[in-house]
Amino acid sequence: MGQQVGRVGEAPGLQQPQPRGIRGSSAARPSGRRRDPAGRTTETGFNIFTQHDHFASCVEDGFEGDKTGGSSPEALHRPYGCDVEPQALNEAIRWSSKENLLGATESDPNLFVALYDFVASGDNTLSITKGEKLRVLGYNQNGEWSEVRSKNGQGWVPSNYITPVNSLEKHSWYHGPVSRSAAEYLLSSLINGSFLVRESESSPGQLSISLRYEGRVYHYRINTTADGKVYVTAESRFSTLAELVHHHSTVADGLVTTLHYPAPKCNKPTVYGVSPIHDKWEMERTDITMKHKLGGGQYGEVYVGVWKKYSLTVAVKTLKEDTMEVEEFLKEAAVMKEIKHPNLVQLLGVCTLEPPFYIVTEYMPYGNLLDYLRECNREEVTAVVLLYMATQISSAMEYLEKKNFIHRDLAARNCLVGENHVVKVADFGLSRLMTGDTYTAHAGAKFPIKWTAPESLAYNTFSIKSDVWAFGVLLWEIATYGMSPYPGIDLSQVYDLLEKGYRMEQPEGCPPKVYELMRACWKWSPADRPSFAETHQAFETMFHDSSISEEVAEELGRAASSSSVVPYLPRLPILPSKTRTLKKQVENKENIEGAQDATENSASSLAPGFIRGAQASSGSPALPRKQRDKSPSSLLEDAKETCFTRDRKGGFFSSFMKKRNAPTPPKRSSSFREMENQPHKKYELTGNFSSVASLQHADGFSFTPAQQEANLVPPKCYGGSFAQRNLCNDDGGGGGGSGTAGGGWSGITGFFTPRLIKKTLGLRAGKPTASDDTSKPFPRSNSTSSMSSGLPEQDRMAMTLPRNCQRSKLQLERTVSTSSQPEENVDRANDMLPKKSEESAAPSRERPKAKLLPRGATALPLRTPSGDLAITEKDPPGVGVAGVAAAPKGKEKNGGARLGMAGVPEDGEQPGWPSPAKAAPVLPTTHNHKVPVLISPTLKHTPADVQLIGTDSQGNKFKLLSEHQVTSSGDKDRPRRVKPKCAPPPPPVMRLLQHPSICSDPTEEPTALTAGQSTSETQEGGKKAALGAVPISGKAGRPVMPPPQVPLPTSSISPAKMANGTAGTKVALRKTKQAAEKISADKISKEALLECADLLSSALTEPVPNSQLVDTGHQLLDYCSGYVDCIPQTRNKFAFREAVSKLELSLQELQVSSAAAGVPGTNPVLNNLLSCVQEISDVVQR
């Protein structure tokens, strides 16, 4: 009869069965074994707990049940007979059989009672009926099956189908370990007075009463005194829990109503294993009858089948040939063998002796959760049901967490739905047993990008915290009834947006506390995310002083009049939340679970992030549709608060969450998305954004829009660099594309791309003109921004953003610009330095001349990383590289904004470092409208050769040109604020600064070039405006605009000094002797790159001069820039570009380092450089 651990005779030391399941079968079935010995007349107010007196005299004379007197436990579990009035009989059968709550207990420890019906299926199993008494004889090896003897015979039954006759589980009202959300789900469809007693899942041993009344479920803690008595109200204490339930079934005594009807146990517990002797996993293929196909996956297909031996419906997963190794397939089965949880799909067996291979699991009739949510009746699947589903998944993942398993593919499509909304996590194809903190996937592994954590995308490393990230996305799927995450956002954009702090917006009707949990799961740093134990606890404590139905109703602007509220109804007004009180006077408020939180406003603190606004169109929004804060006048001032509610006391998660701000995402060299592939689309502004409220995003990403005035043009955004800045910096230095501006919008200038602007700023696509047909999109800059290739009438509107949100409101003007032809014959897409190329010069095109040229010298760092920098041989003294000019309309009287060097953050933070693969052509002799200049509104009809100088209120001088030099292109009389843009086409002839990474001679040492200076004292402390302009061939040319620059890593020159152009600062520029040849594409290969990396690694281990190391490093960068496009997988490309960025920064540090050459271990700069080279090699070898 199977293997036994021990034989149980008359000895009192009975081995206890395994833990019971938390749910049982539905209503008790009538049994006609015996009639009630004493017929009774039942009155109208019938209560099943009031008819117990006659059971006290019933004494059990024997086990076999052949005595006429009968035993009290057996009588307790049979329904009323025909001598009871029909109404009373129907109620008794509906809610449960009559129970003896006050009778004597049994003294036989081996006497058990059946909790559920069980039908024998062979292998010496025994059929039992609910309420039947049994004597346990022993258990099988794993304790999952018990050998019992009843009056019908002897055999095996599941251990979790029986319980000791004196245990609490024999009572119909006791449900064992049940979560709070599961209790609300079980009671949600019942009537007033329905109740259950449960043990808290999060606090074992803590019992509670869950009672439904008037559409609300109330939870009462059952307290225990020192002498072992239990009570709900301190005045009424009892020796046993049964006495307590009997008391409150007759009088409310502090409860909202009396306990009338025990909630039925809806689901039988899971039976692990199909029989007591089936302990081998290999199955006979002929035992399975295959039926229809359910679906297919990456490695195989899933069918419905029947296990003929047990007449059991199963799910059969087959393996496609040549798609997975047999060992990998068996690993999935091995993982499933180790896990046993009510909310994890159970493995039944495998067929691996010959192909095709099978994995046989339990069958879930309602399919995957994703399709179920999309097709369900939302009036039936209410917010209570959704919360119940999420709690089950959280419980399953907490179990995996304790077992050190990671799932790696947690999503709604991989969860299955059964009867009574039971959800089980399935698809363990990627699951792994964790032996350390993280697991690194093998090369070529595929993962769903929108569900995968950022660290997993970048480094292929997985942990339980990466599953927590996926669980947050799964919550979002549940809250939206199966919507696809990141709607309208391409896969290539997801990491890019996440890195900048973007997170999905709060779904319509989603309670703020649930959204807080999502945002906590989406913390950038894995250490800052909660564990699954904490998320499970969060669901237990989420709605102490309210119900989720009421929260959803308030979110949707509806009165919480019923519990059946559809939690996803768009565009309803949001009503202010208020603290809810009980609908009936409750005398025992201190014992209601969560009563200590009754004074807290659970919904008063609004969830952070973007709040819902007008519905987005059916296009592809890459920014949230919710662009306005729920409290328009509120401005979040602390970035630490952006992931939680303003009031931490009211936040459900604050009791155990780490109060840490997520670290700033690492800045990469370039965007992970490819350049725009639709150059023909044009955009123009159509929206009005005068009422956009101040926003602050999570993870340290903050920005504040300019305030609109009646006479100001609505603000517009353009693609610049992304940099992180403190909000409202009073220093307000000059602003460049890399975030040198003192706060304000400067932190997000790189956040808007044409695809993003199209949806969020009301852009509409226009038709290209005939002259634009040949135009090509310009490669994206190193700051992850990009510009569209053209606009109607060859015009593009650009926006210059305010430098400081506390300074005077600056007028934002639109600047006319045309698309530029990208440099020809460029093999590397990210080379940010200009390249001398005679044949690459584009034909001159008629364009308006520059109107205002800022004058002044510029302090430039060594080896400037940008490509928009060029100095001609004919540059006059005092003319350097142009920075950024802040010159709003009326600047003389309003004070203007300070000028500073473009691209150098004042606070020392480095912007995104350029990748050595983007082409940045140099300037033509004709004016390019990508570089806006200032127009003097007062100078008209001035000869072209007359140079006039304008000075603002701070003493900054600007070169003014007459208006007739500008062709009519709109907005002639408005001054422009100069902002660095994407680089223009190359000129026919120019002497350029050559990037060392493209030098053919690595030993060549460039000479130094010092930019001339022409400075003017400012009125605020003698700081100088570091600005320069480059006239070309004596003509009135336009300023050369440098892109964002990385500050010097030296102690003598601070970024703040460079940004403000401190007097006397002169920084030498490296200039090569001659233009170098690029490495041809056919010479770039994986082997060549690894060989170059090994050469640099070898050089680092020997005492060689720094200059030699720098030259070797630049040669490696040259190979990397050409090899990046050869990497097929986006995830590996992410990590590769980030490693190249680190290498380039390390080379910059080494170049300016004054430390003597050494070996790694003694020089930290060399250590960093060696780690970067090793990281590049690792990524390439994946």
UniProtKB/Swiss-Prot annotation:
Catalytic activity field: L-tyrosyl-[protein] + ATP = O-phospho-L-tyrosyl-[protein] + ADP + H(+)
Keywords tagged on the record: Acetylation, ATP-binding, Cell adhesion, Cytoplasm, Cytoskeleton, Kinase, Lipoprotein, Magnesium, Manganese, Metal-binding, Myristate, Nucleotide-binding, Phosphoprotein, SH2 domain, SH3 domain, Transferase, Tyrosine-protein kinase, Ubl conjugation
SMART domains for this protein: FABD (SM00808), SH2 (SM00252), SH3 (SM00326), TyrKc (SM00219)
UniProt region (Disordered), positions on chain: 1-47, 60-80, 611-641, 654-674, 763-794, 807-851, 964-1024
Location of N6-acetyllysine modifications: 776
PANTHER family the UniProt entry points to: TYROSINE-PROTEIN KINASE (PTHR24418)
Protein name according to UniProt: Tyrosine-protein kinase ABL2
Taxonomic source organism: Homo sapiens
Highest classification ranks of the organism: Eukaryota, Metazoa, Chordata, Craniata, Vertebrata
